[in-house]
Amino acid sequence: MKNVLILTLMVFFVAPLVAQAGNVGITKDLMSITVQTEKGPIKIIRNQDNKAVINPGFAKTSRKCPPFCVQPHTVAPGVQTVGELEVIKFMEKGGLIIDARTVEWHVKGTIPGSKSIPYTQIASRLNEIGCKKGAKWDCSNAKTVLLFCNGLWCGQSPTAIRAMLREGYPASKILYYRNGMQGWQSLGLTVIEGEMS
């Protein structure tokens, strides 16, 4: 009888503690991925603390509009809007992720492996993503890139995308992560401090 009592106590008190360790997956089949950054490999996981809450910087629901207006789901014809799982798959394939936010936002925290090209500079820095400068940009060898900013209410990456398109970047080579940092952080995904560019 004593053994049954001990076993029952273990099931009710110890098993939940064991189950909590590593119980927050990205999907039911994926716990983490590792991406290469300039500082070495970084593991992308979700926060394993079931009581964690979103970063207070992204908890606000109402920001003055303009400038913080809700952005359209489709930022431009031909540009594909993606969610978190598509971002992770893009990362796994070594895709180039662009943090289109200002440097001040970028250094506070960014998606690991992302490159900071602020929306105010992107039109003059297309050479960093496969275009060649001439009388006009030649983007025939442009890389497929994924851009993000702060989230649904942030216009920095949509502004960057429109600037890229205006300069001749092919829409089919641009992915737009509309949920941005707010969506990334709401899922407890890994964030690192950005570097000054």
Give residue spans per PLM region:
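Short, solvent-exposed loop/turn and secondary-structure capping segments
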Residues: K108-I111, P158-I161, L187-G188
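Flexible, polar/low-complexity N-terminal or interdomain linker segments that lie immediately upstream
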Residues: A19-L96, W105, S197
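Catalytic cysteine-centered active loop of the rhodanese-like fold, especially the PTP/DSP P-loop
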Residues: K132-G183
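Active-site neighborhoods of enzymes that stabilize oxyanions during catalysis
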Residues: L187-S197
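Bacterial N-terminal signal peptides
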Residues: I6-P16
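Positively charged, proline/Ser/Thr-rich regional signature most characteristic
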Residues: V70-W153, G194
